[in-house]
Amino acid sequence: MSIQMATSYDLEWINNQYDSIGFVRSDLKRDKVAIITYNNEYAGVGRLVQIDEDTLEMGGIYILPQYRGIQLAGELVSFLVETAKKLQVQHVYCLPIEELEYFYKKYGYTEVDTTKEIVHPIVLKNIIGV
């Protein structure tokens, strides 16, 4: 298993995966995309999206079906969390579906109370669908 940051060479494969599951396509000028490989094969993808200079959103985590159940998603999230720390941004948000809240809490994410904390307007829009 290995994880590396994507290059323009990888972008077609990345966006084919995102298209297949209805996710927004990646743009390497805006997104920091990581690819996880297993036995030298592409196994999954995830990204950090720049919201503004102080804010990233982690998301787009997708592991191909044949590679699920071997903790690759956790490895990918850990890699992205470490990447975000190296970038020294102030806020990193993740907007998981309810079933994945526990999974992300294992990696240090906490639930944001939008009535008590200031949240970037784009993130707030995604949270409450404004």
Give short role names for the model-derived ranges.
Residues M1-L28, I35-T37:
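Short amphipathic alpha-helix that is part of the acyltransferase structural core
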Residues Y9-W13, E53, E98-Y102:
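Short alpha-helical
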Residues I35, E41-Q50, D54-Y62:
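Conserved beta-strand in the GNAT
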Residues Y42-G46, E57, L80, I118-H120, ...:
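Membrane-topology and secretion signals of cell-surface/extracellular proteins
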Residues G69-E82:
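Conserved acetyl-CoA-binding loop-helix of GNAT-fold acetyltransferases
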Residues A84-I97:
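Conserved GNAT acetyl-CoA-binding A-motif
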Residues L95, K105, T110-V130:
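Conserved catalytic-core motifs of GNAT/GCN5-like acyltransferases
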